[in-house]
Amino acid sequence: IYVPAPAPAVYAPYAARAYAAPAVVAAPAAPAVRAAAVPVAAAAPAAVAAAEYDPHPQYSYGYSVNDALTGDSKSQQESRDGDVVQGSYSLVEPDGSVRTVDYTADPVNGFNAVVHKEPGVHAPIAAPVPAPAVPAGHVRTTVAAPAVAAAPVVRAAIAAPAYATYAAAPIARTAVAAPAIAAAPIARAAYAYPYAGAYF
C-alpha cells in the first residue's frame, strides 16, 4: 500500500530584531577653569604638655546625710596618702541599728574592712497599723442585681472550602507518515595534492 508523504512544513523566515542607535547630541564644552595656586599656611604645631605624674597622690573627702522626714541617715569619709587609702562609712538600718564600716587599702595588705554594728540611738520606726476591714457603724444592705437577658448562643458553622475543577486539555495527536527508507549512494572520495609535483 502506497502512502503519500505529508507536505513539508513551511515556516516564516526568522526576523532579527533591530534597535535604533541612540541619538548623539553634541553639547558645547564648558570653558576650562584653572584654580589659582594659593599658598596654604601650615598650622604651627600645638605644644602639648604631658600630664604630670604625681608619685605621691593625696586626696580627702567626706559627706553626711541626715533626713528626719525619710529617716535616711548616712555618712562617708575617705582619704588617700600615696598608695594607702583609709575611710569609713555608716548608715542607719531599718531596725534602727547603726552599721559602720572602717576600711583600709595598701599595696602590702590589700583591701581590709571591719564592720561594727551598734544598737540604735533612734527609736525604731513603728510599722503602720492596718485599718479595720469593716468601718464602724456600717450597715449591711442587699442590692438586687439588674436583670440581664442572656445573649443568644450563636453557633458558627464552618463551610467546607469550594474547590474549582477544570477540564483536562484534549490530547493532541499528530499523524506522521513512516519515513521512506532507501539506501544512501556510495560516495567516492577523490583527493588532490596540489603541491605534490612542486619540489624546490
UniProtKB/Swiss-Prot annotation:
Disulfide bonds: none annotated. Sequence repeats lie at residues 20-23, 26-29, 43-46, 126-129, 144-147, 150-153, 159-162, 177-180. Residues 56-127 form the Chitin-binding type R&R domain. Keywords: Cuticle, Repeat. GO terms for molecular function: structural constituent of cuticle. The tetrapeptide (A-A-P-[AV]) repeats found throughout the protein are also present in many proteins constituting the protective envelope of other species. Component of the cuticle of migratory locust which contains more than 100 different structural proteins. This is Cuticle protein 19.8.
